[in-house]
Regions:
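Basic, Lys/Arg-rich alpha-helical nucleic-acid-recognition elements, primarily the DNA-binding modules
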Residues: 1-85
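An exposure/low-complexity boundary signal
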Residues: 7, 24, 44, 175-226
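Accessory beta->alpha helical hairpin/"wing" motif in late/C-terminal subdomains of nucleic-acid enzymes
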Residues: 43-45, 53-155
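Surface-exposed beta-loop interaction hotspot
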Residues: 128-201
């Protein structure tokens, strides 16, 4: 049987794999697993398309314009990256499992959460935005506003996370909760099974009241816990030619609330707290600035 010639409507991870395995560009680790090698029967079609799109020339080398575009993936002054988890698109599926594992509480059904891998990098007054979702991969550049660099980077990140601008930043007074309370409340039992949300909330209210947290503050925090989280991503910082740092903040997409930024901080006495606020351009920019300043 003859394998049909594949048709790709746009640049894909297969094209990127073709380039990586011919040493045209380094492997971009932030974009998740790229196919170990493009299917052999696709090779010629991929090469032809890359030439048609002026990514490579007749000698199968990067064109000058393509080199300028792709080097933003790996040659930059600094970058931010993350993985957007689309919880609202989670789909359960069945797997074969030994009875011994089932007996200790591990079920046959697990969930596959769709992921969007992204990276936003900066170099020479240019911001490069890369995104991979399944078999779709996009790479774009935009000029940076040097006078408002971190606001430019925040907007670039939101072109991936909130491309149509339909999600507003959450509108509520900033919430600060003692970190020890959040860490103390178990969300799963010893077997890994999730506790009922109502029992977690009840315990949380008790612990917050015991520590003198204002009722309106604890109420706002509990409301956020109860709300449906449709998607979220950690935002991490990556210095030039170094591995990613461990510090991060989170942007969550909460049903009927909006985009929420969650970070760690300290209260007036220097005690660690969890801070939640609306994920405005200004709030995101400030956290990007802090990550780089570490």
């Amino acid at each position: 049987m003859t394998t049909p010639t594949p048709t790709f409507d746009a640049f894909s991870p297969f094209h990127l794999s073709w380039m990586i395995h011919r040493n045209l560009i380094p492997f971009p680790t932030t974009l998740g697993m790229i196919s170990g090698a493009e299917p052999e029967e696709f090779t010629e079609e991929l090469r032809k398309q890359l030439q048609q799109w002026s990514v490579i020339d007749n000698t199968n080398q990067l064109t000058p314009d393509a080199h300028d575009l792709f080097r933003g993936l790996y040659e930059y002054d600094f970058a931010y990256w993350g993985v957007l988890l689309l919880h609202n698109e989670k789909e359960p599926f069945q797997i074969e499992m030994d009875q011994e594992l089932i007996d200790i509480g591990i079920g046959r059904s697990i969930s596959d959460t769709p992921r969007v891998y992204w990276q936003v990098s900066y170099s020479n007054s240019t911001i490069t935005v890369a995104m991979r979702a399944g078999d779709n991969l996009t790479l774009n550049t935009m000029p940076a506003d040097e006078g408002n660099l971190y606001e430019s980077l925040a907007r670039a990140i939101l072109t991936v996370l909130n491309p149509n601008g339909i999600w507003p930043a959450a509108q509520f007074t900033t919430v600060k909760i003692p970190l020890e309370v959040v860490e103390k409340i178990p969300t799963h039992d010893a077997s890994g099974k999730k506790h009922d949300k109502s029992s977690v909330v009840k315990t949380m209210k008790y612990e917050l009241a015991k520590r003198g947290v204002a009722f309106d503050t604890s109420s706002r925090f509990v409301k956020l816990i109860n709300a449906e989280k449709l998607a979220d991503t950690e935002v991490l910082f990556m210095p030039k030619n170094k591995i990613s740092t461990s510090e991060f903040f989170t942007i969550e997409f909460v049903h009927k609330v909006g985009m929420v930024l969650t970070r760690t901080g300290t209260d007036v006495e220097g005690n660690p707290v969890i801070v939640q606020e609306g994920a405005t351009i200004g709030a995101i920019a400030e956290e990007l600035r802090k990550l780089k300043a570490q």
